[in-house]
């Protein structure tokens, strides 16, 4: 693949965290580095083990292939390969691949002399994954509380986990996470629409500037966050959504064991609701 006109001058040696100059090269447009090799190794090994699991399961249908964690009776110990051991090794591979990819992003940032915002953001995705397959199962005492690797089976796990604690929508951290997800979608949809509007003016007119974009929202709602500010806001909203998604899971079954609707009894029991005729406490 041909280099872009400006690309070659940014391909400079150095900035590596591990391995020195050994893997400090590119394959086409892709920077390799030690962590690129590590990512490939972990990803390839994980895929091979998933294929092995498919052989043991007796199906090659992608919708039916599923790698299950060990049964609850194994606790936090190792399990035979066919009874959850493959899931444990694949989880190690997935974690290794994700962390290596993030560190590869760090090396690219070091080469370009830019901030570490991208690997920092990706670290939140890793946090969410590890919450489900490592932190929460360890806190609950068994790998069997983690989700299986399968298209349909992991959806069944989500449903079963939710209904185990009643209506999961009453989980306050879940409420906050969903609010951030929707707000993030709204903010970035408005941002994308605004940029496309400025880039596609009426026929015969020049492309509009950020001043036009700012003026639109000042006219609309009285305030514009600005071209840089909207990206800061988008990052804040998206990271908050991921953080509270992880939080809503880590507190379920570890510090809260009942149905989530019961958590809201503190609201019902507030003194100013008491003795209201026809009210819940009346």
Curated annotation (Swiss-Prot):
Localization of this protein = Cellular chromatophore membrane
Q: Which GO CC terms are listed, alphabetically?
A: plasma membrane light-harvesting complex; plasma membrane-derived chromatophore membrane
Q: Which domain of life is it from?
A: Bacteria
Keywords, sorted A to Z = Bacteriochlorophyll, Chlorophyll, Chromophore, Electron transport, Iron, Magnesium, Membrane, Metal-binding, Photosynthesis, Reaction center, Transmembrane, Transmembrane helix, Transport
Which GO-annotated molecular functions does the record name?
bacteriochlorophyll binding; electron transporter, transferring electrons within the cyclic electron transport pathway of photosynthesis activity; metal ion binding
Where, by residue number, does a ubiquinone bind? 217
Query: Where does the chain bind Fe cation?
Result: 191, 231
Residues annotated to bind (7R,8Z)-bacteriochlorophyll b: 154, 174
Look up the record and give one Gene Ontology term from the biological process aspect: photosynthetic electron transport in photosystem II
Transmembrane helix in keyword set: yes
- Which InterPro entries does the protein's record reference? Photo_II_D1/D2_sf, Photo_RC_L, Photo_RC_L/M, Photo_RC_L/M_CS
| Predominant place of localization | membrane
Q: How does it sit in the membrane?
A: Multi-pass membrane protein
Q: Which ranges of this chain reside in the Cytoplasmic compartment per its record?
A: 2-32, 113-116, 200-225
Q: Which family does it belong to?
A: Belongs to the reaction center PufL/M/PsbA/D family.
Q: How does it assemble?
A: Reaction center is composed of four bacteriochlorophylls, two bacteriopheophytins, two ubiquinones, one iron, and three highly hydrophobic polypeptide chains (designated L, M, and H).
NCBIfam families reported in the protein's UniProt record? pufL
Protein name per Swiss-Prot or TrEMBL: Reaction center protein L chain
Q: Which gene encodes it?
A: pufL
């Amino acid at each position: 693949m041909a280099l872009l006109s400006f690309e070659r001058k940014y391909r400079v040696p150095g900035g590596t965290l591990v391995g020195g100059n050994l893997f400090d090269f590119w394959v086409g447009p892709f920077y390799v580095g030690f962590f690129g090799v590590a990512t490939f190794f972990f990803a390839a090994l994980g895929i091979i083990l998933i294929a092995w699991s498919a052989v043991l399961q007796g199906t090659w249908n992608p919708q039916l292939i599923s790698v299950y964690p060990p049964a609850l009776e194994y606790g936090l110990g190792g399990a035979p390969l066919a009874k959850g051991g493959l899931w444990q090794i694949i989880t190690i591979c997935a974690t290794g691949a994700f962390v290596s990819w993030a560190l590869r992003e760090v090396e690219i940032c070091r080469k370009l002399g830019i901030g570490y915002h991208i690997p920092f953001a990706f670290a939140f995705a890793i946090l969410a994954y590890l919450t489900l397959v490592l932190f929460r199962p360890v806190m609950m005492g068994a790998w069997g509380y983690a989700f299986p690797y399968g298209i349909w089976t992991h959806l069944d796990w989500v449903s079963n986990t939710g209904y185990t604690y009643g209506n999961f929508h009453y989980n306050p951290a879940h409420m906050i996470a969903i609010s951030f997800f929707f707000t993030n979608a709204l903010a970035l949809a408005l941002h994308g629409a605004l940029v496309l509007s400025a880039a596609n003016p009426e026929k015969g007119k020049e492309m509009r500037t950020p001043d036009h974009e700012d003026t639109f929202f000042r006219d609309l709602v009285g305030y514009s966050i600005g071209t840089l500010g909207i990206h800061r806001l988008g990052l804040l909203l998206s990271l908050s959504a991921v953080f509270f998604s992880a939080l809503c899971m880590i507190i379920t079954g570890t510090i809260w064991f009942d149905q989530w609707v019961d958590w809201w009894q503190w609201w019902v029991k507030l003194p100013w609701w008491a003795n209201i005729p026809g009210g819940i406490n009346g």
